[in-house]
Amino acid sequence: MLCRALLLRAAGHRQSSSLPLQHLLDGYRCSREDDHLSYGEIGMPVPPFGCSFSAAPNFEHVLAVANEEGFVRLYDTEAQNTTKLISKEWQAHSNAVFDLAWVPGEHRIVTASGDQTAKVWDVRAGELLGICKGHQCSLKSVAFSRFEKAVFCTGGRDGNIMVWDTRCNKKDGFYRQVNQISGAHNVVDRQTPSKLRKKRQNLRGLAPLVDFQQSVTVVLLQDEHTLISAGAVDGVIKVWDLRKNYAAYRQDPVPSKSFFYPGTSTRKLGYSSLVLDSTGANLFANCTDDSIYMFNMTSLKTFPVAVFSGHQNSTFYIKSSISPDDQFLVSGSSDCNAYIWKVSEPSLPPRILVGHSQEVTSIAWCPSDFTKIATCSDDNTVRIWRLQHYPEEEKSVSNKAKLVGWVTQKKPEEQRGAGRSASPQSTPAKAFSVGSPCASSPRPAACAPSYSGDLPLSTNTPTVSLKTQMATACTPAKLSGASPRTSPKLVPSSKMSIKHWIARTPCSSPEVGKKTPSPRKALAEVTQSLLETSSTPKAQHSQAEKRAKRRLDCSKEDEAGQKCLQDCSCVTELDHVAKKSKLNLCHLAAGQRACDEGSLSLADLDNEHEDSTHSPKELSFPGSLVNPSGTQTPPPVLQSPCERDSDVVDKENSSPERKNWLSALGEKLRTGKAGSPPSSYTSSAKRQEAAVVTTSPKTAVNTSVSMRKICTYFHRKPQN
């Protein structure tokens, strides 16, 4: 009978030990009495940064919370009266307290602050026991070993890890580090060995290194000889042997073991939290790529054995904690919630603690009581979640009004899409109408990981709309009253010849219909005479021939005032000053008179347009020479505006129907012997003499234009 009773008792013990606890997670609630506001010196709300439960005997229910203004408060989670809820509070530092740790089994606590110091406090006596000084930047993490009460470690933004021993004597009233790991998580410098040697000699000295970009974010003591650390940028979890004096060596410290980043992100490589289970065999590393990696510390393999996902980690304030029975993992998140996973089944959807309105940062699971979880949030509150069991009718009627937090189940599809979901602080993607032919960019590739924490959001900007706007901006306005045939279609750039490119001036659109008048011709009246002129048979040209010319002005006054006096088909340029054009060869027969008549002012041209019988003024120069043709030739010192502005021969608007320019020059020389220049007159000067200039910005339409060689489009420099 005794043996049978023992067997039944053993079987019952096995059944009770294997009883799943996951169904109990849905019972966590946070009532209004457990929602506490974190405030500073003047009573203003400030965010809490760290929280931790005590492990001292008869003190396990005490929760220590540190906030941004350096205050530390002790909350009695078992107090029935709200007046006795805060057992003690004091301002530990004049700067923010980023982390705190209880001395194992003692009523002492160590705070790590932004004032570059760590302080040891006796919480019962309320006195300061010592100050640890040695860091050059803010302290981000502090940790004790479970087997040591006097030895602890700190990590800071200066990239250094320091080990402290409170049993050592104080120097100048401060505790000094007994071991130091400088540049523990420095990124490998890609400089030459000589530069590295000089840099190391300059920076390596008595003072620790300072590197804000290679901060030590978290430190952890596995035992009295093993330290684990992680950084902000290198993506490597390093294990250090404290029996080695790293301060005695001047070269970069080498860890005894390293766990390299196992994910696929290219820039989110930092770790915000490291947690060991009660056995010290499993390490949980909270990474900023929205994943928690589980490593086996007893194995020689360095890749993770499990990955927990579903939350969001966008800052280095997100912490994790393990349940007392090592079955569950809880973590804060940037999406205003806390998440609970089952360690043995990481693929299952996690439970969600819902209730905070801002990022949930530090979190602590009471090591002596499975039913209590503490969370800190950027909404300036500290909440204590308790495991409660109420009937369904009580949940919905009486207790829901008193609750500020509860547990929900994350859906499997939400967990799969958690990596692709954006942070609440990010701008959501724009939704476009169905059926719109748009291309969104960028998009993750098919081979991309399920999460995209390092990928930018897709803009969903319709590409077609952008192209349409660009095309609209480049298309000139249509002429009112113009017929469709007067506005030819645009010629594709792939089909355009060199004549099309020469015809296009900078910052101008292709020739479509009527061109806008030049800004220099602001006084000219824009009329519809161009359309009438272009419709006549005399002005009909092919599109290629029109594009072979430069842009011409097309006002009514231009056409009336620019007609050649010799009734030829010459064409002049738009602006003789800017383009330095010459008179057409047809003016050579008439001599310089045509140039003089064309050098009238704009008012004279307008008067000439109004009164066709008006005769142009003849310009005379003192000391001018009269050639046999009867025209006056100004001296070389005092030349007409036409000859001053003309430097090179303009062959672009010449017509093949006229004489050859050599024969015209010869005839000029034969008839102008009386006014011939000196014998030193060079051939280039002769070409300059034969050159003619446009005298008016007015233009006329050429009636016949033939294809010309490309060499004629380039001006020839005069030889002085």
Curated annotation (Swiss-Prot):
Annotated segments matching region Disordered: 411-437, 476-495, 528-552, 607-698
Residues in WD repeats: 43-85, 92-131, 134-174, 211-250, 266-305, 310-351, 355-395
Pfam families found in the cross-reference section: WD40
Extent of motif Nuclear localization signal: 193-200
UniProt keyword Repeat present: yes
Cellular compartment(s): Nucleus; Cytoplasm, Cytoskeleton, Microtubule organizing center, Centrosome; Chromosome
GO process terms (BP): DNA damage response; DNA replication; mitotic G2 DNA damage checkpoint signaling; proteasome-mediated ubiquitin-dependent protein catabolic process; protein monoubiquitination; protein polyubiquitination; regulation of cell cycle; response to UV
UniProt feature, compositional bias: Basic and acidic residues: 543-552, 642-660
Biased composition (Polar residues): 528-542
Keyword DNA damage assigned: yes
PROSITE patterns the record matches: WD_REPEATS_1, WD_REPEATS_2, WD_REPEATS_REGION
GO molecular function, one term: protein-macromolecule adaptor activity
Sequence motif DDB1-binding motif, location on chain: 164-167, 240-243
GO cellular component: centrosome; chromosome; Cul4A-RING E3 ubiquitin ligase complex; Cul4B-RING E3 ubiquitin ligase complex; cytoplasm; nucleus
Pathway: Protein modification; protein ubiquitination
Keywords: Biological rhythms, Chromosome, Cytoplasm, Cytoskeleton, DNA damage, DNA replication, Nucleus, Repeat, Ubl conjugation pathway, WD repeat
Family listed: Belongs to the WD repeat cdt2 family.
Quaternary structure note: Component of the DCX(DTL) E3 ubiquitin ligase complex, at least composed of CUL4 (CUL4A or CUL4B), DDB1, DTL/CDT2 and RBX1.
The protein's role, per its UniProt record: Substrate-specific adapter of a DCX (DDB1-CUL4-X-box) E3 ubiquitin-protein ligase complex required for cell cycle control, DNA damage response and translesion DNA synthesis. The DCX(DTL) complex, also named CRL4(CDT2) complex, mediates the polyubiquitination and subsequent degradation of CDT1, CDKN1A/p21(CIP1), KMT5A and SDE2. CDT1 degradation in response to DNA damage is necessary to ensure proper cell cycle regulation of DNA replication. CDKN1A/p21(CIP1) degradation during S phase or following UV irradiation is essential to control replication licensing.
Name of the protein this chain belongs to: Denticleless protein homolog
UniProt source species: Gallus gallus (Chicken)
Gene assigned in the entry: DTL
